């Protein structure tokens, strides 16, 4: 599913304004007019052929906004040709890809203008625009999902190479870029020969790699869409959510980024995480030809075992891209690039590098981001909230206890009933853990 927003010149359509002197929302064209008839024709075409869904959502000062949803198999030119067939005097000025949230907002605008005969909420379900999990007062959400748009605008091999140097790209990343730009590849989309596993110590470091990877794939026509869903904090209940599948079906032609983090599990099959991993493997098998999968493995935050990862990845060929390490010179250049994007300007290189790990001679991208975050936080006091400039944090000294709580309890005089209950609880917990490790149900 690919979502577009078109801006068009409609001055030749001879639409009459209610009052040429009105401004803002009051300057809208008549609520019930030819626009409703045109939208009716677009809707009829959708119900008949199911190729694309087109809707006029707004008109202001001779500028018309049109949104369209296309199946990935449909040539965008076919959609444009149909718009021109219904509106021959209209001239398209611009086209951009939008998120599903933006698309739905335009649908709501159309409904409020009374320019459509279809029920918007029903169309949202029909187009599978809903991707958010259900919310509960008693349980955390099953997953978090966000959406962003990538473009290949102004992207070329030279710019891509410069960006790779800036992020201290690893050898594995350079090798994959060589394959993506290889002249023997045909520049057309027929499916995904490989998917990706990105390993990094920090989500921001992984995003830096993704921000280069997806535009490069777009430039080489390895993707039809620059729209990407970013799914994080998945729990074992994610696969049971009705909207979870919409993420993968709605991303056809585009990308799904899946962070392998969430609930910690005990043992390989102990929790529903294995079932979730198996479900992700099935999604990869089902949608892998039409949707690009990028798995993100953040060191120390992974919620599934190596065996479970292997279960997911067995459903397709994957290229692993790892974060790289660089010396102090490269780390300083990376930090400077991050610092230049902030409001702080009066800083020195020494101030940027003082938070890098002292014991290391080579620094990972994650080390650099950790140093940057500490430097930026310090800068809030010295540049923005200056009243805190000379204020240091209070350091609280904690008294170390030599014994563990259980041993301290046993040393106490009396409390025989409390000690007995504690022993029973610990025994039950050990039994439950043993059952988890062999894959049996919880007690």
Residues covered by each model-derived region:
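Structured alpha-helical bundle/scaffold domains in large eukaryotic membrane-trafficking regulators
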Residues: 347, 421, 434-438
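Contiguous, function-dense segments enriched for cysteine-driven chemistry
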Residues: 183, 413-416
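ATP/nucleotide-binding catalytic cores
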Residues: 2-380
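Conserved small/polar residues in nucleotide/adenosyl-binding loops
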Residues: 441-443
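Conserved helix-loop functional segments at active or binding sites
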Residues: 427-435
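Trafficking entry modules
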Residues: 420-421, 425-427
């Amino acid at each position: 599913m690919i979502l577009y927003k078109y801006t068009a010149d409609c001055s030749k359509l001879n639409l009459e304004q209610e009052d040429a002197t009105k401004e803002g929302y009051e300057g809208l064209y008549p609520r019930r007019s030819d626009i409703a008839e045109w939208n009716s024709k677009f809707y009829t075409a959708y119900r008949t052929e199911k190729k694309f869904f087109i809707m006029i959502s707004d008109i202001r000062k001779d500028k018309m906004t049109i949104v369209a949803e296309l199946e990935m198999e449909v040539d965008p030119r076919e959609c444009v040709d149909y718009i021109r067939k219904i509106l021959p005097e209209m001239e398209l000025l611009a086209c951009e890809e939008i998120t599903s949230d933006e698309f739905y907002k335009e649908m709501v605008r159309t409904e409020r203008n009374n320019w459509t005969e279809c029920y918007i909420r029903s169309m949202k379900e029909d187009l599978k625009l809903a991707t958010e999990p259900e919310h509960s007062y008693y349980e955390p959400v099953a997953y978090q999902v966000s959406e962003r748009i990538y473009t290949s605008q102004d992207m070329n091999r030279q710019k891509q190479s410069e960006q790779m140097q800036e992020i201290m790209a690893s050898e594995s990343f350079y090798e994959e870029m060589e394959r993506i730009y290889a002249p023997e590849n045909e520049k057309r989309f027929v499916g995904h020969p490989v998917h990706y596993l990105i390993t990094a110590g920090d989500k921001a470091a992984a995003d830096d790699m993704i921000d280069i990877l997806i535009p490069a794939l777009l430039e080489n026509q390895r993707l039809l869409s620059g729209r990407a869903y970013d799914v994080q904090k998945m729990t074992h209940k994610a696969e049971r959510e009705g909207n979870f599948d919409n993420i993968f079906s709605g991303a056809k032609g585009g990308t799904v980024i899946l962070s392998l983090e969430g609930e910690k599990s005990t043992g390989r099959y102990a929790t529903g995480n294995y079932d979730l991993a198996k479900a992700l493997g099935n999604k990869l098998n089902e949608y892998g030809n039409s949707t690009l999968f990028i798995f993100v493995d953040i060191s120390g935050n992974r919620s599934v075992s190596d065996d479970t990862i292997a279960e997911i990845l067995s459903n397709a060929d994957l290229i692993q891209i790892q974060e790289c390490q660089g010396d102090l010179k490269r780390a300083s250049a990376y930090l400077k690039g991050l610092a230049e994007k902030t409001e702080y300007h009066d800083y020195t290189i020494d101030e940027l590098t003082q938070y890098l790990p002292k014991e290391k001679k080579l620094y990972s991208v994650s080390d650099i981001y950790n140093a940057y975050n500490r430097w930026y936080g310090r800068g809030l006091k010295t540049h923005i909230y200056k009243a805190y400039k000379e204020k240091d944090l209070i350091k609280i000294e904690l008294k170390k206890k030599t014994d563990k709580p259980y041993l301290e309890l046993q040393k106490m005089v009396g409390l025989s009933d409390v000690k007995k209950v504690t022993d029973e609880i610990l025994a039950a917990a050990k039994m439950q853990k043993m059952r988890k490790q062999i894959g049996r149900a919880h007690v």
